[in-house]
UniProtKB/Swiss-Prot annotation:
Subcellular location as annotated: Secreted
GO function terms (MF aspect): metal ion binding; phospholipase A2 activity; toxin activity
Family: Belongs to the phospholipase A2 family. Group I subfamily.
Record EC number: 3.1.1.4
Keywords: Calcium, Hydrolase, Lipid degradation, Lipid metabolism, Metal-binding, Secreted, Toxin
Name of this chain's protein: Phospholipase A2 BF-CT1
Length: 16
């Protein structure tokens, strides 16, 4: 799902 992928990258961005 595109939403799930977007959520994953957003979570990774938060860890930056």
């Amino acid at each position: 799902n595109l939403y799930q992928f977007k959520n994953m990258i957003e979570e990774a961005a938060t860890g930056t």
